[in-house]
Regions:
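Short, contiguous alpha-helical
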Residues: 25, 29, 33-36, 46-90, ...
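Acidic/histidine-rich alpha-helical segments that form the ligand environment
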Residues: 93-130, 141-149
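Sec-dependent N-terminal signal peptides
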Residues: 3-13
Length: 173
């Protein structure tokens, strides 16, 4: 009986361990929901706001996150990257073009949906495979580096909200 209990005591923690893929899937979902919540808090008439002229507007910042998500998740997974609508790609090249809230939030949401699908499709081999043309990283590195990229820009967006007197959502992880 003692051997059985000892075996179970040692085996049960192994069953509860989370795989890297599961952890990535969980955190991509959380960071997506959190980032979209930040995006939705900015009033539509403030999507062109920039704290200083050299910074991206709030709308451009949200679209920049979405575009980077598409690139990273496509490279990591091997899935075909969805096309970026012309209006949005033009706005990222020309900072004088405004991006409206509905368009930005939809694009951002769609980018996280794509990333959630991409992460779900990943095999251990894909996580370890090197991908990229000019910048080569493993699938895991693409996902993790752009996870942190999203956090960086979400932090900027939270400052934009605070400048406008809007309290960002509480931090979640």
């Amino acid at each position: 009986m003692k051997k059985i209990l000892l075996t179970l005591a040692l085996a049960i923690p192994a069953f509860s361990q989370t795989s890297i893929k599961d952890a990535l899937a969980k955190h991509w979902k959380v960071t997506g929901d959190f980032t979209i919540a930040v995006a939705k808090l900015m009033p539509a008439d403030q999507y062109g706001f920039r704290p200083v002229p050299i910074e991206l507007s709030f709308g451009q910042l949200m679209v920049q996150v979405g575009g980077a998500n598409l690139n990273a998740c496509a490279l990591a997974s091997g899935m075909t990257r969805p096309a970026v609508p012309t209006k949005l790609s033009d706005a990222l090249k020309d900072e004088k073009i405004d991006i409206d809230k509905d368009t930005a939030v939809k694009f951002l949401s769609d980018s996280f949906d794509f990333c959630n699908q991409a992460v779900a499709s990943m095999t251990p081999e894909k996580l370890d495979a090197v991908a990229g043309t000019t910048r080569k990283m493993t699938g895991f590195e693409w996902l993790w580096s752009y996870f942190t990229h999203t956090a960086h820009h979400r932090g900027q967006a939270e400052v934009y909200l605070r400048i406008k007197g809007i309290k960002p959502p509480d931090y979640v992880f």
